[in-house]
Regions:
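Short acidic-hydrophobic catalytic motif
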Residues: 1-142
Length: 142
């Protein structure tokens, strides 16, 4: 399925995200929460990045996993989770995707209000949304 990331008007900054990887250990997950300092610290900051074992070499060659270890990442191999002390949250995968959205949208450079609805998001779609918000709001003219 395709990636979709949109922003709708809202009084608060909220992210609603669905991920689905088609693998049993990484089944469909959904999370919706207001993004505040408190929710960031309690619900998102501890969510680690993740990848299938088969992609590790490719990521290393591309220089994308510098400093990566089982202390700060989750690896999926043959339907099993490989991570120090297991998952931190039952839905750690979607939490990490929401964490990515927060980080990528910080490129807007302003405090956001609005509901982000994300389906299978990734860095390219998140950054494209950040750029579009800057364009529409006139922040690129400053």
């Amino acid at each position: 399925g395709e990636t979709r990331v949109v922003i709708l008007p809202d009084e608060e900054y909220r992210i609603s995200c669905t991920v689905s990887f088609g693998a049993t250990v990484m089944d469909t997950q959904y999370l919706s929460l207001p993004v505040t300092r408190e929710s960031f610290a309690a619900e998102l900051a501890g969510a680690r990045t993740f990848c299938p074992y088969e992609q590790i070499e490719e990521l290393m060659v591309a220089g994308l996993v510098r400093g990566g270890s089982l202390d700060n990442a989750v690896v999926i191999k043959d339907g099993a989770i490989i991570a120090k002390d297991g998952l931190r949250f039952p839905d750690e995968f979607v939490r990490h995707k929401v964490l990515d959205i927060v980080g990528d949208l910080s490129l807007v450079g302003r405090r956001l209000r609005g509901q982000i609805i994300a389906i299978k998001p990734g860095h390219p779609s998140n950054v494209a949304l950040a750029q579009r918000i800057r364009e529409v709001m006139g922040y690129d003219d400053e």
